[in-house]
Each structure stands twice: as C-alpha cells, then as structure tokens.
Regions:
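Glycine-enriched loop-and-adjacent helix/strand subsegments that border the catalytic/binding cleft
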Residues: 13-141
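Anion-binding (especially nucleotide phosphate/pyrophosphate-binding) glycine-rich loop
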Residues: 1-14
C-alpha cells in the first residue's frame, strides 16, 4: 500500500561483517591481487536500510558504486566453530547491496571504512530466505 515502507528483513543486527574482494572477477576488475585470506571489514548499524530506501550520497562524493552480495544471516551465536559445522549457524540468506564511495575508500589511505560505512550504504532484502530453502553455492547473482 502507498505510504508503507518495507524495512530490512533484519532490523538491528549485532554485527555486519563483510568480505572484500570475495569474487575473483571483482579483484581483477579493480587491479588487485586475489587475496589468499579473506579481507574482512565491518559496516556500521546505520548502514542497514530497507531494499527500496534511498541511498544517501555523502557530501563531496563523486565515485559512488555498489556490489550485489549475498548476506549470510547468522541464527545463533558462533564462537570457535569448526569449518565443518559453520553452516549449522546460518539462519538464512538475503540480498544486500554493498554501497561504496570509491574515492573515499581508495584515495584516503586505503581506508575501506571511510568508503563503505556511510548511512544507508547497506540496503538489505527484501526477503530473508531460510537456510533450508536454498543452496547458496548454486545461485546466479
């Protein structure tokens, strides 16, 4: 209905951990080496917004970009989890757009947080699909 806003399927995540250069094609596209270890970074809570919310451009931004990602939504606390058991902790999956301001990210001492943590830089959803409903390794994105 008109005037109704669809929010993110996970409203207030305790943590939003992202993996940088997680697609070989994207690493090559940016001219960077394919990492041998995951490059982890955080997005802040105010990055999360609904799938149809406006993305707010930061002041002086001129190189906005986005990447389609799959979000793994954890369903229970995970600490010292064996690799073979890791998927048992996943409650479900959602679509996420990892929004970036590339000049802030790359030209300011390579600080990913500066380019990836602005308000609304993590549109999420619209749906959360339960872990038993799909095989995340068999998705076209």
């Amino acid at each position: 209905p008109e005037g109704v806003r669809l929010g993110p399927p996970v409203a207030r995540p305790w943590s939003f951990i992202a993996v940088g250069l997680n697609y070989a094609d994207h690493a090559r596209e940016t001219g960077q080496e394919i990492p041998t270890e995951p490059i982890l970074f955080n997005k802040l809570g105010n990055c999360i917004c609904g799938p149809y919310d406006d993305v707010l451009y930061p002041k002086n931004s001129d190189r906005m970009d986005w990447e389609l990602e799959i979000a793994f939504v954890m369903g229970k606390r995970a600490r010292y989890v064996e690799e073979k058991d890791a998927m048992d902790y996943v409650a479900g999956y959602a679509i996420c757009n990892d929004v970036s301001e590339r000049r802030f990210q790359m030209k300011r001492n390579g600080q990913w947080m500066k380019g990836k943590c602005a308000e609304t830089f993590g549109p999420l959803g619209p749906w959360l699909v339960t872990a038993d409903a799909i095989d995340p390794s068999n998705l076209a994105m």
